[in-house]
């Protein structure tokens, strides 16, 4: 599966006290153990079984062997159609496969997905399959922000956030850290500028005041997870 790699113990951006900014669309695609499947690794801790955040690209007709998610798997479909024996998932699909679940993923037309592995709270056994293109939106923390809730469990919150063009977002802090993947549009803050494909991880206790670009922005945003318990990796 996505996390099998024949390397020595790998540590990539595992210090959650540090800010990480990656412009993923400029990163090279690296081969995975499965033919036709490549990835961009954003953070990673572990050997063959790893706690990892990646962007994964399936070529048309590629697939993985059946595998079990020992620590859970979270997927957001960015492009194309991702599939397994349970269904077909178009762009905007949000999936959570809790610890102990098994599937055999593939893609007939090809796809690009954002994947987080082995990052479930030990008590979280909820399966999620949400089509965000048809999802409902509610008000965010200030006027000009709309939020679609994807998942929430014991202080960890995952949402899609839609922000109006040229919006100045009020200064706010991230007590449990924050992670953003820019899906559309762009924004800037005190630490940098971010466009489609930018991934930023802000440490617990950090703060910022984003200014949204002239075309607005659509973000995948997770908060609280950098201080939350997760399933332990096997020894």
Language model features: what each stretch is:
Residues 83-100, 189-208:
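Short acidic-glycine-tyrosine-enriched beta hairpin
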Residues 3-48, 110-155, 235:
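A short, N-terminal "cap"/entry segment at the start of jelly-roll beta-barrel domains
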Residues 54-55, 65-69, 86-87, 105-106, ...:
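Short histidine-centered beta-strand/loop micro-motifs
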Residues 132, 138-184, 189:
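Surface-exposed interaction/gating patches
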Residues 64, 76, 82, 95, ...:
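Fold-core signature of tandem repeat domains
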Residues 59-62, 69-84, 174-190, 196:
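Glycine- and acidic-residue-biased ligand/ion/polar-headgroup-sensing regions
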Residues 37, 88, 99-123, 204-230:
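Ligand-binding loop in jelly-roll beta-barrel domains
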């Amino acid at each position: 599966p996505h996390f099998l790699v024949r390397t020595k113990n790998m540590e990539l951006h595992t210090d959650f006290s540090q800010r990480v900014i990656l412009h993923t669309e400029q990163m090279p695609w690296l081969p995975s153990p499965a033919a036709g499947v490549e990835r961009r690794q954003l953070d990673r801790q572990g050997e063959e079984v790893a706690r990892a955040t990646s962007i994964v690209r399936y070529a048309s007709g590629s697939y993985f062997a059946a595998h079990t998610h020992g620590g859970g798997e979270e997927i957001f479909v960015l492009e194309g159609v991702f599939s397994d024996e349970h269904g077909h998932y178009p762009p905007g699909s949000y999936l959570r496969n809790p610890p102990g679940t098994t599937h055999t993923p593939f893609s007939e037309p090809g796809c690009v997905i954002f994947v987080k592995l082995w990052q479930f709270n030990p008590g979280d056994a909820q399966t999620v399959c949400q089509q965000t293109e048809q999802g409902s939106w509610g008000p965010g923390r200030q006027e000009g922000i709309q939020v679609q809730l994807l998942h929430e469990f014991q202080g960890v919150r995952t949402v899609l956030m839609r922000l109006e063009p040229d919006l100045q977002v009020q200064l706010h802090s991230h007590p449990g850290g924050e992670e953003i993947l820019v899906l559309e549009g762009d924004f800037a803050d005190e630490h940098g500028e971010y466009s489609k494909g930018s991934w930023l991880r802000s440490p617990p206790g950090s703060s910022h005041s984003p200014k949204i670009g002239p075309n607005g922005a659509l973000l995948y945003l997770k908060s609280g997870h950098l201080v939350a318990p997760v399933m332990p990796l096997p020894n």
